[in-house]
């Protein structure tokens, strides 16, 4: 029988948000947020996902309980911090990464850091709505610092993912803009050359919305010597906000990890 522990305090709560601890879970799923996002959305997955998975959502500096900390300005710095937080909880169980958009790049660099420094790899990496890190077709990120508040509001409406009533809330927008600026600056500085050989060995699955403007997701296959799959679901860049899509993703992740564990062990 599944054992679950619901708690306000979490293990290593500074960086990792785990709302539902499952001591009997076979796998740990580590989720990485989109630009301007927090940990809550993915942390809630742990309450409804299959009992085989314990979900930990990454909480970046400058938001939620870390709001007093300065924003990170380097993706490699973020990866190092995440790895330090992860090590105590991933040594005893298989784990996987899921990242959406900006979070896909953090997940990738974190996986690289784990392999290079600790000879560890996620059982499976799930990326979402993100061009390959070395792709020449990565979307041009607008310079948020040069946009007016109204232009940022329009950009959020077009891009999706943020409810309209929140975008029109002045207090919310004032909180959101600094987060977006910090994360967008990281994305703009993140440059990655096409690898001459595979950097990872585990399978990568890429989810994307059918109406998303993101291109060259196929380039992720250059990253790994493992299998690579693309799954297209109805919707735009934030297709995963649709309940049916979210349920599909969670169920698919569980099935993939069950199959991957058979090959791995």
Swiss-Prot record:
BP-aspect Gene Ontology terms: medium-chain fatty acid biosynthetic process
SUPFAM superfamilies found in the cross-reference section: alpha/beta-Hydrolases
The entry's keywords: Acetylation, Cytoplasm, Fatty acid biosynthesis, Fatty acid metabolism, Hydrolase, Lipid biosynthesis, Lipid metabolism
The protein's Enzyme Commission number: 3.1.2.14
Modified residues (N-acetylmethionine): 1
Residues annotated as the enzyme's active site: 101, 237
Pfam families linked to this entry: Thioesterase
Catalytic reaction(s) noted: (9Z)-octadecenoyl-[ACP] + H2O = (9Z)-octadecenoate + holo-[ACP] + H(+); decanoyl-CoA + H2O = decanoate + CoA + H(+); dodecanoyl-CoA + H2O = dodecanoate + CoA + H(+); tetradecanoyl-CoA + H2O = tetradecanoate + CoA + H(+)
Family stated for the protein in its record: Belongs to the thioesterase family.
Quaternary structure and interacting proteins, as annotated: Interacts (via C-terminus) with FASN.
PANTHER family with a match to the protein in the record: S-ACYL FATTY ACID SYNTHASE THIOESTERASE, MEDIUM CHAIN (PTHR11487:SF0), THIOESTERASE (PTHR11487)
Function, as annotated: Contributes to the release of free fatty acids from fatty acid synthase (FASN). Has broad substrate specificity, giving rise to a range of free fatty acids with chain lengths between 10 and 16 carbon atoms (C10 - C16).
Protein name: S-acyl fatty acid synthase thioesterase, medium chain
Naturally occurring in which organism (per UniProt): Mus musculus
């Amino acid at each position: 029988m599944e054992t679950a522990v619901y708690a306000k305090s979490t293990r290593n709560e500074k960086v990792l948000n785990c709302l539902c601890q499952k001591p009997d879970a076979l796998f740990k799923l580590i989720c990485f947020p989109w630009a301007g996002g927090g940990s809550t959305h993915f942390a809630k997955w742990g309450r409804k996902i299959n009992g085989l998975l314990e979900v930990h959502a990454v909480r970046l500096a400058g938001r939620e309980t870390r709001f007093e900390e300065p924003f990170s300005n380097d993706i490699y710095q973020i990866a190092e911090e995440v790895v330090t937080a992860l090590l105590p909880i991933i040594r005893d169980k298989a784990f996987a990464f899921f990242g959406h958009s900006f979070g896909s790049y953090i997940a990738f660099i974190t996986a690289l850091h784990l392999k290079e420094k600790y000879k560890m790899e996620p059982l499976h990496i799930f990326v979402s709505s993100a061009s390959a890190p070395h792709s020449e077709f990565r979307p041009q990120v607008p310079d948020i610092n040069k946009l007016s508040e109204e232009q940022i509001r329009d950009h959020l409406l077009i891009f999706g993912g943020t409810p309209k009533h929140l975008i029109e809330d002045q207090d919310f927008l004032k909180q959101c803009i600094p987060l977006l600026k910090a994360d967008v600056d990281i994305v703009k500085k993140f440059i990655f050359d096409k690898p001459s050989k595979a950097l990872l060995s585990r399978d990568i699955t890429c989810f994307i919305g059918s109406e998303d403007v993101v291109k060259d997701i196929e380039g992720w296959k250059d990253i790994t010597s493992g299998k690579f799959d693309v799954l297209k679901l109805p919707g735009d860049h934030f297709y995963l906000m649709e309940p049916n899509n979210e349920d599909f993703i969670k169920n698919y992740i569980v099935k993939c990890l069950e199959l991957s564990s058979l090959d791995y062990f």
